[in-house]
Amino acid sequence: MEMKQMKFLTHQAFFSSVRSGDLSQLQQLVDNLTGDELIDESSPCSAVAELMSVQNDAGETAVYISAAENLEDIFRYLIRFSSLETVKIRSKSDMNAFHVAAKRGHLGIVKELLRLWPELCRICDASNTSPLYAAAVQDHLEIVNAMLDVDPSCAMIVRKNGKTSLHTAGRYGLLRIVKALIEKDAAIVGVKDKKGQTALHMAVKGRSLEVVEEILQADYTILNERDRKGNTALHIATRKARPQITSLLLTFTAIEVNAINNQKETAMDLADKLQYSESALEINEALVEAGAKHGRFIGREDEARALKRAVSDIKHEVQSQLLQNEKTNRRVSGIAKELRKLHREAVQNTTNSITVVAVLFASIAFLAIFNLPGQYFTEGSHVGQANIAGRTGFRVFCLLNATSLFISLAVVVVQITLVAWDTRAQKKVVSVVNKLMWAACACTFGAFLAIAFAVVGKGNSWMAITITLLGAPILVGTLASMCYFVFRQRFRSGNDSQRRIRRGSSKSFSWSYSHHVSDFEDESDFEKIIAL
């Protein structure tokens, strides 16, 4: 019983010394306790450590009291005998020594604790309120900066209601704290609480225009963010009757002036509910100037305007329809004429090109027979005869070269004689002439290969073979591709005609309109490339 009384008296004296700030008396008390410990248990620190953990009726330890009262000398003396677990002991107010020092703005004690145990800045109370939050809401900028320097991530700690320190600092208009938090991590601006509110939602509830500007400068994309009730920052600023903040929000071109919340209300609807005052008039005027509307008019046109438009449409419907039909008929007729003209020009250009190519082929074939390699006999009974006349390659060359010459001459005669006024007749002539030119081209190719075998000689026949292997696939591939395009064009023409008939029968044009467009459709339904 006497031992309990002694401990009680010791504790009372100990707490009295701490509260009075009498360091010498406290040291004497601790020294006496340490001396007794040495005699009884030979453990000088256990009794003092136990004394550091003792709590008074309010649940406060000696370290807690010195931190709360900003007794730095007492605190530095006691902290030598304390551990992290001792500092983390909470009082009945649900705060530990570090928490209460941060909340009350005791910078020296906060820095000392951060130096010893940096992890203290992440220890929260029962409501998950961090020491940073407690210091921020009290506008203790130096303490906030000290904790952010040690651990910048502690700014992202949220309370049980989902709010960060920026939410509350923005609500109370603590500009210095807002700047410090955003400077460390701008991502904190987009954090939403359990009501879906960002820091901007909270800031517009206050009266600090600078805080709202600071948040929007950090991230203007949250301008149209909605909370769980569908309210944007403009809704809340209007409902709270904040004319300056409302005007600031409306200066952003990205703002949704007519955003509708879950109650189907716009900012204009909320402005109408405000009590009559100068602020309400300023807000209403700013919203009207920005083009704000009531929720009942969003998504549908004004009835009077719609009725006026309907009457005007009915009045001019017949005249405008007739004029439009006449313009359309003239336009379609003009397009059809231009298209037919383009067809004729294309066919004529092809005809001219074929004539030039045919003349070129004939010239080459004619000159080739008189410019043979090896030249001719100049003496004897065979004067004028080619030196290579006896070779098979020369004979093949003469045959194919003559064939190419005669075909080219025939094409030239046809081109300069026949005149086809109709486009379809021109296409038929060009189609036949094209096939003749294919034959002339093939003969010229064969003549070249034949004379190549004669020129290189038997010892270098590999050169002629190489030329043949190189040229034959190119020419054969080209002619095969052209044949493919020709046959595809022929086979598709019948299908296209049937499709045009079905399409024409399904259209509900008037007789006069279809009469004008039928020819145009027939002429305009064509491939980008036509093979003749």
UniProtKB/Swiss-Prot annotation:
Subcellular location: Membrane
PANTHER family, per the entry: OS02G0735700 PROTEIN, PROTEIN PHOSPHATASE 1 REGULATORY SUBUNIT
A cellular component annotation (GO) from this entry: membrane
Protein's name according to its UniProt entry: Ankyrin repeat-containing protein At2g01680
Membrane association type: Multi-pass membrane protein
ANK repeat coordinates: 9-38, 58-89, 93-122, 127-156, 161-190, 195-224, 229-259
Keywords, in A-Z order: ANK repeat, Membrane, Repeat, Transmembrane, Transmembrane helix
Record-linked SUPFAM superfamilies: Ankyrin repeat (SSF48403)
Transmembrane segments: 354-374, 396-416, 436-456, 467-487
